[in-house]
Amino acid sequence: MKEKILTFSSDPSSPVTRHETEEDTGDDLFSLRPCDFEDYVGQDRTVETLRIAIAAAKQRSEPLEHVLFHGPPGLGKTTLAHIIAAEMGTSLTITSGPALEKGGDLIGMLTHLKRGDILFVDEIHRLPRTTEEFLYPAMEDFAVDFVFDKGIHARCHRYRLNQFVLVGATTRVGLLSAPLRDRFGIFRKFDFYSRQDLARIVSRSAALMGLTIDETCTMELARRSRGTPRIVNRLLKRVRDYVQVRHGGVITVSAIDDALALEGVDEKGLTGLDRSYLETIIQYYGGGPVGIEAIGATLQEETDTLVDVVEPFLLAEGLLQRTSSGRKATEAAYRHLGVQWRG
């Protein structure tokens, strides 16, 4: 496989992974991640759904139903998979769709799962179709079918699996096949975070990092973090570094402005790529409509990156319209870029 598979256990004395590296287990990867529902901020309906489902499953002494999370990247899907494993007292194995190139890769993982263990597949929409087909009986009947020989000599042998829980995550739920999508019992969409929830995350993370930050500064970071916890934590770390070296260790709004200017993040949270995306539509294509392939070719960026990373926030902020004839920059986008609205 091209990508690593990580295995975690709810037993604190167990190793993080059989394939761990310093990068995998570094402080930055895990130190800010909530360990339980009490510390998890946001996605309230999803959390409540999972609390109820987990409590019911534990009362019946059954594994949890299969779970599918979908939404933009960085909103806490992987973190919730860790919390589910901790709440259920089971082990968590993490992989991704592109890493499961062959059916044998998937089968090898499934056969090592114990009852109730969780298999988290990120980017599950990128599973090869031949690999995906092995999941159907595995999810529904907890079995995998092996076919031996071909033609009139073909024989099928069914191998029983322990009852596991599949947690899938995707940024492109529309690309999932109906047979796979319909096999998930719990289906939840992740939304961008409010500024209030992001400010709570900043306060919590700052406390864990030993930083002092006031309410004005937490809201300033929240405002410029694209509604995304992963980004707000990353920006907080950059601000921490900046004030440590350039600002006497004191976090102020002006220090945040200076630190984020170095990162190319403007007052609305747009990055250089976001602004280039909007400028391309306005300057090269008269404000649109224009197809995503044309935008990608002009920017020399992959269309998947634009669709998954750039567009969701621009749509949520009202800076972009996505129509049947293509993408259009809104009046708000013109104003933000300081360009005269063409109407």
UniProtKB/Swiss-Prot annotation:
Record region (Large ATPase domain (RuvB-L)): 3-193
EC number in record: 3.6.4.-
Entry annotated with the keyword ATP-binding: yes
Pfam families: AAA_lid_4, RuvB_C, RuvB_N
Residues at which ATP binds: 32-33, 74, 77-79, 140-142, 183, 193, 230
Positions of Mg(2+) binding: 78
Sequence segments annotated as region (Head domain (RuvB-H)): 267-343
One annotated GO biological process: DNA repair
Subcellular location: Cytoplasm
Compositional bias annotation for Polar residues: 7-16
Matches recorded under CDD domains: AAA
Molecular functions (GO terms): ATP binding; ATP hydrolysis activity; four-way junction DNA binding; four-way junction helicase activity
Sorted UniProt keywords: ATP-binding, Cytoplasm, DNA damage, DNA recombination, DNA repair, DNA-binding, Hydrolase, Nucleotide-binding
Reaction catalyzed: ATP + H2O = ADP + phosphate + H(+)
Cellular component GO terms held in the UniProt record: cytoplasm; Holliday junction resolvase complex
Taxonomy, superkingdom: Bacteria
PANTHER family associated with the record: HOLLIDAY JUNCTION BRANCH MIGRATION COMPLEX SUBUNIT RUVB, PTHR42848
Function: The RuvA-RuvB-RuvC complex processes Holliday junction (HJ) DNA during genetic recombination and DNA repair, while the RuvA-RuvB complex plays an important role in the rescue of blocked DNA replication forks via replication fork reversal (RFR). RuvA specifically binds to HJ cruciform DNA, conferring on it an open structure. The RuvB hexamer acts as an ATP-dependent pump, pulling dsDNA into and through the RuvAB complex. RuvB forms 2 homohexamers on either side of HJ DNA bound by 1 or 2 RuvA tetramers; 4 subunits per hexamer contact DNA at a time.
Entry-linked NCBIfam families: PRK00080.1, ruvB
HAMAP family named in the record: DNA_HJ_migration_RuvB
Quaternary structure note: Homohexamer. Forms an RuvA(8)-RuvB(12)-Holliday junction (HJ) complex. HJ DNA is sandwiched between 2 RuvA tetramers; dsDNA enters through RuvA and exits via RuvB. An RuvB hexamer assembles on each DNA strand where it exits the tetramer. Each RuvB hexamer is contacted by two RuvA subunits (via domain III) on 2 adjacent RuvB subunits; this complex drives branch migration. In the full resolvosome a probable DNA-RuvA(4)-RuvB(12)-RuvC(2) complex forms which resolves the HJ.
Family of the protein in this entry: Belongs to the RuvB family.
Name recorded for this polypeptide: Holliday junction branch migration complex subunit RuvB
